[in-house]
A protein has these predicted regions:
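Short, charge-dense linear interaction motifs
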Residues: 2-245
Length: 245
């Protein structure tokens, strides 16, 4: 009986020692990330890539003293542009209306009589043509202008799927951030222990744009074929990271 009591007492003592070992002494503080120094850095990356799709934005604009006539003439010319593109082999699904408006303004009739005005109605139909074969972008411009479009607003060269390049740019930006942190730490004579936080500042891409004004549209009508040479698009990413040492 006495032996059993001694065994139980020993067990209790052992558990007490183990329990005390789990308790942090009030005077001893466990290390946390906040106890370390912080190095904050930004990482940036730019990837260039050849575009694989283009969007040609054009417009048909008509004006007349009658709103009905302006709208009807605009519809006729717009249909002619779409039909010409389809006859040239483009799918009708590649042509979308991206804007339409019918507005009016006052125009002076007689320069000698400043009080005499007439109302002019302006119909404006904007079309966006998606082009998959970049070699035919110039053909789209020529066909549209000859069929009735009187403005080429812009030509954008884009990517069908930019997500893979965005991820690659983020990886490159993260690698640059780490390299910066290591360089700073080495210069300061400290060693990086780990990363506290990292987050994406931005990622995206910029299409290659060819912007044209009305005078340039007129020049295109005088020359054929229209040479359109695409440029590379840029995919960019930026991250912010904090490392502790």
């Amino acid at each position: 009986m006495r032996k059993k009591v001694m065994i139980k007492a020993g067990t209790v003592l052992l558990l007490a020692v183990l329990f005390c070992g789990l308790i942090v002494h009030p005077g001893v503080k466990a290390n946390t990330v906040e106890d370390y120094g912080i190095i904050s850095v930004y990482g940036e990356a730019v990837i260039t890539a050849a575009p694989d799709i283009a969007r040609v934005v054009m417009a048909v604009e008509t004006r007349h003293e009658s709103a009905k006539t302006a709208a009807e003439e605009n519809a006729r010319l717009t249909d002619a542009v779409i039909d010409a593109l389809v006859q040239a082999g483009f799918d009708k699904k590649q042509v979308k209306t991206s804007g339409y408006r019918l507005s009016s303004y006052e125009q002076q009739v007689d320069p000698q009589n400043r009080e005499k005005y007439m109302t002019i109605y302006r119909a404006y139909n904007e079309l966006t043509v998606t082009v998959h074969d970049l070699d035919t972008v110039g053909n789209v411009v020529d066909i549209a202008l000859k069929a009735g479009a009187n403005r080429i607003l812009s030509i954008r060269f884009e990517l069908k799927d930019e997500e893979a390049l965005k991820l690659q740019a983020l990886q490159n930006a993260t690698a640059q951030a780490k390299a910066k942190a290591v360089a700073i730490a080495q210069s300061a004579g400290v060693t990086i222990k780990g990363i506290k936080v990292i987050h994406e500042e931005m990622s995206g891409y910029s299409p290659y744009r060819v912007s044209l004004d009305q005078s340039e549209s007129a020049k295109m009508m005088e020359q054929a074929p229209t040479p359109i040479i695409p440029g590379d698009v840029e995919v960019t990413a930026r991250v912010k990271a904090e490392y502790f040492f």
